[in-house]
């Protein structure tokens, strides 16, 4: 009898370990009623699993709903992932970015986002045909997407528009770049305003894109991004961006 059970047990163990079925088998750790909607919208039919290796950190309560820092650490997938998505489930524009690591991008970054109301925040990392999902919940008074920011209320906003500040630091296994771009990042959700936001970001090495991001208007005004790249201190990077009005920005990272 034992001889017949061994093959059956082996098949059952393989089936239970398969990442393709864990999305349905696992309970949503954030217990969000919007999870299934955005799983289908952003992740499609690709297998999905909740994974503690995708670590998402944010303040438990957002004191400034227009500037909420999100830290993502999925270093376990460094060199073995093809895309990363970040979305805020209850924002009117839920998707924040679509990150493609290409040759140099690593799965460790931070960015400031808008928060319209208390919400679950998700990060999905595509690795070897499976979406690995982590997340957290942020409470807040909200209004970050529909309240005017300060960028255009200051007299000097047009003077500073497009100004870039960038630095690079040693950070194993490569280097950490920090970039701040002066831009209003208007969502178009405020009456009498049109969408005006950065939509494409790239880190350039040796004249070629080394990592890229597609942004949405849920990124905070005067966006700040920190990203770990493979290149060490000898690598030469440029930061390039383009907004939806065709303005282009270019800056060498020292």
Regions found by a protein language model. Give the residues of each.
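Ligand-binding face of N-terminal immunoglobulin V-set domains in extracellular IgSF glycoproteins
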Residues: 107-112, 120-124
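Short beta-strand edge segments in extracellular beta-sheet folds
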Residues: 137-143, 254
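N-terminal edge beta-strand
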Residues: 38-67, 154-172
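Aromatic sugar-binding surface patches on proteins
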Residues: 102-110, 217-228
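Surface-exposed, short loops/turns at beta-strand junctions within beta-sandwich domains
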Residues: 112-118, 228-235
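Short acidic/polar inter-strand loop motif in beta-rich domains
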Residues: 127-135, 242-251
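Short amphipathic, basic-aromatic surface patches that mediate peripheral association
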Residues: 74, 180-193
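Short, aromatic- and glycine-rich surface loops/edge beta-strands on solvent-exposed regions
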Residues: 84, 119-127, 235-244
